[in-house]
Amino acid sequence: MEYSSYNVNTPQWREITVGSHLPAELRKLAEIAHNLWWTWNDDVKKLYCDLDPGLWKEVEQNPVLFLERINYEKLVALAHDENFVYKMDAVYSAFKKYIDVEPDHQRPSIAYFSMEYGLDEVLKIYSGGLGMLAGDYLKEASDSNVDLCAIGLLYRYGYFDQSLSMDGQQTVNYKAQNFGQLPIEKVMQPDGKQLVIHVPYADSFVVHANVWKASVGRIPLYLLDTDNELNSEFDRPITHHLYGGDWENRLKQEILLGIGGMMTLKALGITKDVYHCNEGHAALINIQRLCDYINGGLNFGQAMELVRASSLYTVHTPVPAGHDYFDEGLFNKYMKGYPGKLGITWDNLMDLGRHNPGDKEERFCMSVFACKTCQEVNGVSKLHKSVSQQMFAPIWKGYFPEENHVGYVTNGVHLPTWCAAEWKKLFKDNFDENFFCDQSNQKIWEAVYGIPDEEIWNTRLKQKAKLLDYIKSKCSKDWLRSQVDPALSVSIFERFNPDALLIGFGRRFATYKRAHLLFTDIDRLARIVNNPKYPVQFIFAGKAHPNDGAGQGLIKQIVEISRRPEFLGKIIFLENYDMDLARHLISGVDIWMNTPMRLAEASGTSGEKALMNGVLNFSVLDGWWYEGYRKDAGWALTDKRTYQNEQYQNQLDAEAIYYLLEHDILPLYYEYGGKNYSEDWVKYIKNSIAQIAPHFTMKRQLDDYYDRFYNKLSEHFHILAADNFAKAKMMADWKANVRSRWDAIEIKSIEAGNGLNATIEAGKEYEVTVVVDEKGLDDAIGIESVIIRHEGGQDHIYEVIPLSSVSKNGNLYTFKATSGIFNAGSFKQAFRMYPKNALLPHRQDFCYVRWF
């Protein structure tokens, strides 16, 4: 007899998406939920919250998930609640009025590419400052009615969630996103199927990417994900993690963003005037754009003229190590088919990504490729412009760093997103009615001086109380999960003083951010935080990259210090720094502190967000604060570096922090006089809002991009593209002609009134004459005298004197100028020859230089 008590097969699961069944009267709620306009609209959030405050909190303020989980009977009742329907209709009316406005077609249209977007904590496609900036940019583009579309990647797991063990060790957790519960929608084709882009990754295979759309107000953000059953087990995870995996997966992601992104726009029939690479990750858009023009009948040189003329590259990192470099073998594995499509050699393609063309040992750098295929390049602050000019100087060796064309637009923040509701109401009640449309107008902001001090102070106290409640709630949950001793938790909150000055520090934990600086002299810090006359507390938050052991060590060190008896309740580290935590921190603390190594902070925007909430900044003069600092409106550590020795400099900066806390900041905060607040502290707040805030809004940033880059790019592109690309073809031919004759050009003679002597008299002018055989180039070159001076360990331009072409005899051109040096000292002089053409946007566009 056969006997068995076990017979079970494997379930054949299939995915089923059950949509929320809203009563017809409430369908407007779903429409609003699927547009991220709600992320910066307080009335919408209040509408959802009032329906079920507990559920709204439970779903982490995700309206799509909220409508899925809310009790259906409650919805039916609400559909017949006249008061609620009235509120909903008012919000929906405002939404439709906003959305239905046509974009401004008088301004150039933009295609924007970024690896990450920080739009809301609900949509986990961001990790840090780059994403925050990109998310804010889309929101302001929507508010400013700009014709812009964006491309990014949709990550299944996003960036990691952080938890801390009892001893402060960072633990990385990844939670899969359910795309059906996010404020995104599938991009559908006429046949009713989701649009899928087939991206070539090598000659032998393609990767299939699903296309999604997130509506950011009026702006469409198209997102690609590779979790498609048509893909292999090796390719489905390409978009699982933001900045996850090895260098091979990073390259796969960047191919998807750049090449796949352009293929997506083509499939959707979208063309724009300007293509903006937000960091080098997106640079491969220009590979695909070149291919498209070449497929249309142009050659490589002609296509490059058009691509360059309509491309902008924004660099965010201030150090060479922060850029993506790929070994030639790896790059060849995925890109070997492109030289044939472009009509160039493999070495030609590699050289587009090298500082030193022809150097076989040099890897392919996306940032270098971006510089060489984009007409315009910009840093993200005034100081970062100079840093970037130095960093990219090897690409344009014929020019000194300060001469190259790298510009800047200082980052700003989206005011409606980061300004707390109470502050927005205060501004709305007291400022000009056009305030939100004219945020860069300092005259409007100066109305803050007319707001009573008590109102300013009470608004600050409300935000601080909200933060303290948030901290207690968050820590209770986090510490329970990590099994922190309950007695320790009680002791921390017993010693926490709600009336103490509160200083916040929140950012990515990389060593150059110097989170450890405050702890340089532990004994002195203990005296400061335990001074009963001037109580002060510090709140830290931030994630370290999973591969950054030093950054994780800093977190562990701070957590360990915070558990010491003298620091209990005085220093707290909050885990899992995300947009929600950031929003509470930057509005609730009294001071926002930032202590990076000098020239290591490209811009930084967290301090700008704090600024919009009446929080004062205390920072190194780097990034945005180098431009923003005003006396009596915050505090600064000097931008000067005293010691080359990093340890000595850290000690000096720590001393400055302690001194300013003890002698300036704390006495000012507690100078109550006869009131329950410090009048001088409120004066600092008003100065900060009136004098600094108007210069760091995203509205100002967007306007700057148009004024400094988009307008001229669009104008130049349309000149080249007119009449079937006539001038693009002409410029390509002209450059080819210059290349072929350049080495043959002869310098026939150089004459100078001083006889080219090494010693000349200060202030005495003399004539310089240069005769050149241009070899048939027909006045296509320029000559200039370059005088340099050695200062600060480097050679810098003292003066550049252009020589004028005064006569021609066959191919012989005579150039003359009057020269002279009006300061005594040691100088160097040389002559520089370069190609010239009225259609060149700048010299680095065609970087041919001969020194003589």
Q: What residues fall within each predicted segment?
A:
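Catalytic cores of carbohydrate-active enzymes across secretory and cytosolic contexts
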Residues: 1-852
